[in-house]
């Protein structure tokens, strides 16, 4: 196509309006037209990455194939577009400042006074252009975290102003705002949108397209009013009404010609509207599913759904491909005990023992693992969930009553989960775990091999602790098989009990690899087993 086109997505009025979903939807529509598209997220916080953030603070920490701990929006980008993102797709203010300060310490600025403008803004601009320059994408969509008016966002908005001036028709700004409905007056109010756009204009950025989040349809007069007072064309005012699923949003945007408006404004041919056949097939299959499969998620962050966002989406996708709707029941591992486990888990079709860190709520995960093993309920343990399945097995089948992970009990005599050798000398917490995609070889006579239908796989990891190979023989002899092994480190990646319907734990995070059009085979297999329970 020639020069890379840059689309900036900003937000106003309120946070959590769905900039990530709009960015993903734009990306999906452009991708469907044959363009090579990627999406990046700029987060205005000063952490280097979200790896050390509490899930209650920031939701799930997503992991890219190259081992970067990233914002959960990258999960949306990958699920919608079926692409793989990298460290370059998620930048924080902390990383920007660290890069500039490191350059200053090296003497790269030749003794100049380092300032927000031009040094910080130049570093932001360099990172915006990096993906286009290095990988020759046709479109780079850049989502700016936060809300217009936040102090933290100012350097990013100044960078957008400069880039729009420098790139001309090759840069475009989509601004997402909220149109509230006042029930007392039975009226939609556009004033917050007008003020948000005015705030953006005061910073030198004129939005080219407005996407209005709303719970009610916006009539033509209201759209004309917004267009007039915000200096945008009428066809550039698009509504984003509440949908039953986020996966409907690309179709809703396509119906209003959002992708066509973008192409026109960037001087590109519009051509035929792509049919999005497989995407529509997925949505039709989802809508036509009448039966429900009930899955319990046992974890310590269950009050906040975003803490397990990728798992929820993976279960939802897998259920669709099994022609089912999925009902999720959240079970707090902190409050799960032998006395109430039957009430909590006895009626469900399957159980996911969620990942996590630390000892809080760990005993409840052991209770869940024991109950589902003894009652032959399909069970999927992920990362710490897999470790809990192994510890429970050691305690109640092998007879090691004090079996534990070194993470939870440094004095345990039976450390069936041990710290990885290369982690022993590490003291810093941020970005130091075993992160990213690693190879795994599957045993052919296993349920996981049946699911994957291939022997060599690659999956993403985020952990410091591993299954202790000193116990492997005892586990195997007692019935828990180690069926997935890393060929380089001999690390146990997957355990399963083949005599049970579906009792599998993975040290890796399969949820990071599941997409709308290619659901993860383990989740599909798990849901199928849960249906057959």
Curated annotation (Swiss-Prot):
Homotetramer. This is CTP synthase. ATP binds at residues 16-21, 73. InterPro entries: Class_I_gatase-like (IPR029062), CTP_synthase (IPR004468), CTP_synthase_N (IPR017456), GATASE (IPR017926), GATase1_CTP_Synthase (IPR033828), P-loop_NTPase (IPR027417). The lineage of its organism: Bacteria, Pseudomonadati, Bacteroidota, Bacteroidia, Bacteroidales. It comes from the Bacteria. CTPSs have evolved a hybrid strategy for distinguishing between UTP and CTP. The overlapping regions of the product feedback inhibitory and substrate sites recognize a common feature in both compounds, the triphosphate moiety. To differentiate isosteric substrate and product pyrimidine rings, an additional pocket far from the expected kinase/ligase catalytic site, specifically recognizes the cytosine and ribose portions of the product inhibitor. It is an enzyme of class 6 (ligase). The gene is pyrG. It comes from Bacteroides fragilis (strain ATCC 25285 / DSM 2151 / CCUG 4856 / JCM 11019 / LMG 10263 / NCTC 9343 / Onslow / VPI 2553 / EN-2).
């Amino acid at each position: 196509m020639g020069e890379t086109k840059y689309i900036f997505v900003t937000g106003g009025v309120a946070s959590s309006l769905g900039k990530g979903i709009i960015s993903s939807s734009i990306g999906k529509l452009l991708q469907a037209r044959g363009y090579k598209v990627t999406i990046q997220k700029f987060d205005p916080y000063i952490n280097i990455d979200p790896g050390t953030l509490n899930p209650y603070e920031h939701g799930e920490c997503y992991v890219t194939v190259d081992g970067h701990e990233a914002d959960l929006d990258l999960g949306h980008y990958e699920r919608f577009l079926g692409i793989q993102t990298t460290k370059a797709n998620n930048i924080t203010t902390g990383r920007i400042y660290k890069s500039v300060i490191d350059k200053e310490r090296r003497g790269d600025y030749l003794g100049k006074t380092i300032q927000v403008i031009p040094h910080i803004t130049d570093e932001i601009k360099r990172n915006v252009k990096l993906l286009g320059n290095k990988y020759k994408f046709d479109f780079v969509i850049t989502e700016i975290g936060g809300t217009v008016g936040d102090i933290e966002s100012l350097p990013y908005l100044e960078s957008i102003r400069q880039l729009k001036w420098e790139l001309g028709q090759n840069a475009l700004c989509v601004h997402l705002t909220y149109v509230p409905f006042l029930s007392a007056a039975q009226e939609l109010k556009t004033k917050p949108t007008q003020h948000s756009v005015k705030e953006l204009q005061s910073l030198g950025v004129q939005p080219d397209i407005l996407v209005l989040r709303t719970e009610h349809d916006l009539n033509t007069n209201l759209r004309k009013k917004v267009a007039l007072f915000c200096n945008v064309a009428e066809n550039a005012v698009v509504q984003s009404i509440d949908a039953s699923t986020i996966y409907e949003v690309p179709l809703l945007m396509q119906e209003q010609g959002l992708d066509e408006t973008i192409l026109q404004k960037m001087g590109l041919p519009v051509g035929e509207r792509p049919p999005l056949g497989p995407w529509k097939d997925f949505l039709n299959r989802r809508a036509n599913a009448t039966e429900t499969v009930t899955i319990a998620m046992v974890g310590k962050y269950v009050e906040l759904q975003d803490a397990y966002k990728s798992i929820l989406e993976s279960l939802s996708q897998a259920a669709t491909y099994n022609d089912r709707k999925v009902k999720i029941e959240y079970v707090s591992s902190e409050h799960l005990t032998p006395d109430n486990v039957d009430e909590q888990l006895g009626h469900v079709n399957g159980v996911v023992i969620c990942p996590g860190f630390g000892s809080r709520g760990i005993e409840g995960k052991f209770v869940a693992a024991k109950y589902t093993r003894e009652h032959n309920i399909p069970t999927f343990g992920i990362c710490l969930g897999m470790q809990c399945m192994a510890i429970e097995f050691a305690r109640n089948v092998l007879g090691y009553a004090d079996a534990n992970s070194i993470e939870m009990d440094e004095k345990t005599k039976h450390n069936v989960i041990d710290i990885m050798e290369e982690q022993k000398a590490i003291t810093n917490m941020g970005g130091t775990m075993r992160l990213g995609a690693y190879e795994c070889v599957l045993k052919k006579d296993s349920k996981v091999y049946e699911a994957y239908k291939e022997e060599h796989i690659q999956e993403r990891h985020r952990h410091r602790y591993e299954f202790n190979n000193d116990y492997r023989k005892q586990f195997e002899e007692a019935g828990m098989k180690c069926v997935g092994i890393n060929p380089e480190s001999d690390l146990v990646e997957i355990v399963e009990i083949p005599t049970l319907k579906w009792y599998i734990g993975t040290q890796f995070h399969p949820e990071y690899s599941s997409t709308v059009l290619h659901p993860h085979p383990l989740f599909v297999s798990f849901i199928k087993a849960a249906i057959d329970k």
